[in-house]
């Protein structure tokens, strides 16, 4: 496979990750209005004023603009080169373009017209899908280079494992929205203790922001336990299928790091590094879970053909 196409895939995936984390940086630093209510200009200028909020917001917009060029190029090139090898290519190329433009549109509308916490949470959720689409498209490019298709040999995925893969993917997306809602309602430090909320009221939440925070913690705890269950099933029953075995090991690592970074956000009183790490780990986890969905689609297709 063309080395330039591989390089483009890696670069595009990296830039999409930068855009995703950059959006979290804009939110964490309160830089959403760093360029005023103007888009694409920044206070009527192409280049930003030399203050942190304007530079952060402008940099996020610039990275988003670069990502549009890269994603369009990657989608078209991969569609031309690897569609004959992988039938999923066209779907992923279209997905990456559609969700990228939805992501950009929501961001622009939020700047110009203002937005609420629910809309901004939706913006982050769409950004995750956009990133995952590009990530999987890049994986396909590398897989297409395997002359014997060693990475995509026929799989055997039982109904129990399919349930875990699909269920955890859907549920993790819901948990992502609860986390984004925590961020956009400024509820990150509503509960100063872990795992309970505070010394008051036996550690239970008493007002809206505390309920938002504890609701996210409860949802995240269930996700953590569910991934442990799925990982144990993979370790005991899928040792010979590397994509599934190592995929769940990766998920277990990412969800553990995700939980630790979330705890450190509370104890560090919203340290920026931990907050950005929290966004990074969930992006990695979601990418692996989306790849599982691709494996299921392949398995079902090959089962119908046999």
Curated annotation (Swiss-Prot):
Protein name per Swiss-Prot or TrEMBL: Heme A synthase
Pfam families in alphabetical order: COX15-CtaA
Function description: Catalyzes the conversion of heme O to heme A by two successive hydroxylations of the methyl group at C8. The first hydroxylation forms heme I, the second hydroxylation results in an unstable dihydroxymethyl group, which spontaneously dehydrates, resulting in the formyl group of heme A.
Annotated source species: Bacillus subtilis (strain 168)
Cofactor list: heme b
Amino acids binding heme b: 216, 278
Pathway involvement of the protein, from the record: Porphyrin-containing compound metabolism; heme A biosynthesis; heme A from heme O: step 1/1
UniProt effect for mutating residue 60 to L: Inactive. Contains heme B and heme O, with mainly heme O bound to CtaA
GO biological process: heme A biosynthetic process
GO molecular function: heme A synthase activity; metal ion binding; oxidoreductase activity, acting on NAD(P)H, heme protein as acceptor
Family according to the record: Belongs to the COX15/CtaA family. Type 1 subfamily.
Effect of residue 278 to M: Contains small amounts of heme B and heme A
HAMAP family referenced in this protein's UniProt entry, alphabetically: HemeA_synth_type1 (MF_01664)
Recorded consequence of changing residue 123 to M: Inactive. Contains heme B and heme O
């Amino acid at each position: 496979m063309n080395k330039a196409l591989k390089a483009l895939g890696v670069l595009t995936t990296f830039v999409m990750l930068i855009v995703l984390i950059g959006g979290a940086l804009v939110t964490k630093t309160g830089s959403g209005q760093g360029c005023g209510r103007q888009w694409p200009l920044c206070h009527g200028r192409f280049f930003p004023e030399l203050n942190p909020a304007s530079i952060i917001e402008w940099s996020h917009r610039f990275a988003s603009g670069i990502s549009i060029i890269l994603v369009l190029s990657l989608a078209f090139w991969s569609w031309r080169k690897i569609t004959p090898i992988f039938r999923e290519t066209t779907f992923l190329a279209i997905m990456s373009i559609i969700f990228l433009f939805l992501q950009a549109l929501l961001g622009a509308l939020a700047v110009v017209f203002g937005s609420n916490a629910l809309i901004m949470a939706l913006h982050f959720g769409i950004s995750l899908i956009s990133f995952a689409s590009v990530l999987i498209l890049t994986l396909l490019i590398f897989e297409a280079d395997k002359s014997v298709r060693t990475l995509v040999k026929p799989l055997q995925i039982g109904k129990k494992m399919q349930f875990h893969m699909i269920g955890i993917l859907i549920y993790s997306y819901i948990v992502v929205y609860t986390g984004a809602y925590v961020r956009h309602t400024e509820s990150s430090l509503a509960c100063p203790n872990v795992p309970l909320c505070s010394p008051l009221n036996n550690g239970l939440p008493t007002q809206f922001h505390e309920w938002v925070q504890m609701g996210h913690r409860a949802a995240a705890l269930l996700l953590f336990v569910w991934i442990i269950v799925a990982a144990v099933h993979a370790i005991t029953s899928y040792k010979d299928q590397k994509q599934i075995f190592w995929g769940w090991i990766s998920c277990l690592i990412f969800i553990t790091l995700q939980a630790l970074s979330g705890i450190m956000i509370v104890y560090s009183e919203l340290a920026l590094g931990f907050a950005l790490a929290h966004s990074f780990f969930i992006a990695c986890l979601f990418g692996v879970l989306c790849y599982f969905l691709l494996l299921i689609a392949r398995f079902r297709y090959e089962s119908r053909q046999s």
